[in-house]
């Protein structure tokens, strides 16, 4: 037979309410952090062109090869399944994996030798790609091209999915010509 007196119940309720209040404060603090750090990228921004010394004028009577490539922040080997597409992954498998994928991406570009190349989901600094500056990596490899980077995504640290948060992301589009 278990005897519970009202002072024990009162003490237990205080502990449970304290735990609930602490959790509520943590959640409210995080929501406030995400909300206060949010800012929409401005429309019609003036972007800086990084000019190459080998720039040349376009000719109207010449064919040009154009390439577009969503590099998926260099995290997508064939067995990768992104969580927002119904998969399980939110980050690259490893920093080494991002570096390897960047080399593979650069190999594809060099194989095709486009006159113009447009890339999406290129991380400048992001948890999901282990803070590798992919814009700098691509720019160094294609130094004979002029380039323009336009940031279109800059998020606070996102604790989603819970098991492996996507983290903080600064990402955009880069064009080489």
Which residues does each PLM region occupy?
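N-terminal, active-site-proximal structural segment of metallo-dependent hydrolase catalytic domains
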Residues: 4, 8-141, 149-170
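A substrate-binding/cap region within the structured catalytic cores of diverse enzymes
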Residues: 170-172, 177
């Amino acid at each position: 037979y278990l005897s519970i007196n009202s002072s024990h119940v009162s003490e237990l309720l205080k502990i449970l309410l304290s735990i609930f209040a602490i959790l509520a404060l943590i959640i409210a603090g995080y929501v406030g952090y995400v909300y206060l750090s949010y800012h929409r990228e401005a429309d019609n921004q003036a972007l800086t062109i990084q000019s190459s010394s080998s720039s040349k004028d376009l000719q109207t009577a010449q064919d040009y090869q154009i390439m577009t490539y969503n590099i998926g922040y260099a995290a997508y080997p064939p067995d990768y399944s992104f969580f927002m597409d119904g998969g399980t992954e939110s980050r690259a498998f490893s920093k080494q994996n991002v570096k390897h994928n960047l080399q593979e991406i650069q190999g594809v570009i060099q194989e095709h030798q486009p006159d113009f190349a447009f890339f999406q989901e290129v991380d400048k600094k992001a948890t999901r790609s282990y803070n590798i500056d992919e814009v700098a990596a691509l720019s160094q490899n294609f130094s004979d091209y002029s380039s323009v980077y336009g940031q279109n995504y800059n998020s606070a640290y996102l604790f989603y999915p819970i098991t492996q948060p996507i983290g903080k992301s600064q990402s955009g589009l880069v064009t080489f010509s």
